[in-house]
């Protein structure tokens, strides 16, 4: 049998079955030498763990007048490529020889969620503990350096899984569209580029409502990858108000109690109004919140962690994606039948319309 020298092998891949019948993929690449286990959730579709409020809010968004035209304009202006170029020139691209530990955590998460193609990962200099995922044809993830300084390895992996969840669920195209629309609204007082009268306040509210609900789906991806609700909780807690110096003085049980207290506030209808106003600000895109409050997210993910749906996914019973891996969300009208009266989409649409009418009334009065 001929002998092969590894240093002479380029892009050479083999598949072997061990005695224990566990399948490993050996990727002997001159640039990346590692043993890669098969994905934890092989072929999983983002729809398998997508939160129903995410689906409903997207349905509402797509039904708001002006969405289709905005989508066509977004594609025309190609928002995706400039952002990728920016980070290629202004951030550090993570790889086997650049932030090797972070890359290992990233590869594990990519494997577990069976994301293909592998997104590009960047670290950018920013002390705020934040991250985001963008791109459809060439997806990428950006971690602020503050994430690396605040979190431990398990928690960094949780953040990476969260962003991969956005990619897996097909959120990134809508996120980019929202960012582009908001930048147009913020930069141009008199709409140009054929967008005059297009980006209504109702459409803006619908974008932000969907954006917040999309986070709930990605939190589920975090739990699937970490398989540890405590890691998810500690990550949320640290991003909410973590500290290196006083890390020993924070308590997860107290954070959970705070989450429960926050939910109790809804018993007073006036508190619900205040929450709505806090999320939506004055109606300006710069004052609206893109994420749910961490204690609210904590409630939803703890609820799912004890669900039968989560248990079945862990057992391997879940919806599979196509050959491409991640599920893309195309820019088109939904094919699902219209919801029944008083469904969640109807409620959101009614709130958006009422709020837009009030904003218009105040503008006329002013």
Regions found by a protein language model. Give the residues of each.
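Catalytic Zn2+-binding segment of zinc metalloproteases
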Residues: 164-183
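Active-site His/Glu-centered metal-binding helix of metallohydrolases
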Residues: 151, 160-169, 217, 221
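Substrate-binding clefts and substrate-entry loops adjacent to catalytic sites
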Residues: 192-209
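Active-site-proximal gating segments in proteases and membrane effectors
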Residues: 66, 123-131, 203, 223-327, ...
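Short pre-active-site segment immediately N-terminal to the catalytic Zn-binding motif
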Residues: 143-158
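An active-site-proximal "capping" alpha-helix that borders the catalytic cofactor pocket
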Residues: 106-109, 211-232
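Hydrophobic or amphipathic, alpha-helical segments that drive membrane association/targeting
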Residues: 21-137, 243, 311, 319-366
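Short, basic, low-complexity termini and linkers enriched in Ser/Thr/Gly/Pro
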Residues: 1-30
């Amino acid at each position: 049998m001929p002998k092969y020298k590894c240093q002479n092998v380029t892009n050479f891949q083999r598949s072997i079955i061990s005695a224990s019948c566990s399948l490993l993929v050996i990727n002997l690449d001159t640039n990346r030498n590692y043993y890669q286990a098969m994905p934890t959730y092989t072929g999983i579709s983002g729809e398998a763990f997508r939160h129903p409020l995410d689906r409903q809010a997207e349905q509402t968004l797509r039904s708001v007048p002006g969405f289709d035209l905005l989508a066509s304009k977004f594609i025309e202006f190609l928002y995706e490529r400039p952002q990728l170029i920016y980070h290629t020139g202004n951030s550090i691209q993570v790889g086997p020889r650049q932030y090797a530990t972070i890359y290992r955590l990233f590869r594990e998460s990519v494997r577990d969620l069976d994301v293909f193609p592998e997104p590009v990962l960047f670290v950018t200099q920013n002390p705020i503990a934040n991250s985001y995922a963008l791109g459809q044809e060439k997806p990428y993830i950006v971690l602020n350096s503050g994430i690396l300084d605040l979190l431990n390895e398990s928690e960094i992996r949780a953040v990476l899984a969260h962003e991969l969840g956005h990619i897996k669920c097909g959120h990134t195209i809508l996120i980019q569209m929202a960012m582009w629309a908001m930048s147009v609204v913020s930069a141009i007082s008199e709409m140009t580029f054929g967008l005059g009268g297009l980006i209504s306040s109702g459409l803006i509210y619908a974008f932000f409502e969907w954006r917040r609900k999309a986070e709930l789906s990605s939190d589920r991806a975090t739990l699937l990858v970490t398989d540890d609700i405590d890691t998810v909780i500690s990550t949320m807690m640290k991003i909410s108000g973590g500290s290196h110096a006083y890390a020993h003085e924070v308590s997860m049980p107290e954070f959970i109690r705070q989450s429960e207290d926050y939910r109790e506030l809804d018993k007073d209808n006036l508190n619900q109004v205040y929450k709505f106003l806090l999320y939506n600000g004055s109606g300006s895109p710069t004052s609206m919140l893109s994420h749910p409050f961490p204690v609210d997210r904590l409630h939803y993910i703890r609820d799912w962690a004890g669900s039968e749906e989560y248990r079945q996914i862990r057992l391997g019973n879940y919806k599979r994606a196509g050959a491409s891996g991640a599920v893309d969300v195309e820019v088109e009208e939904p094919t699902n039948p219209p919801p029944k009266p008083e469904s969640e989409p109807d409620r959101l649409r009614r709130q958006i319309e009422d709020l837009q009418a009030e904003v218009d009334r105040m503008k006329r009065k002013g």
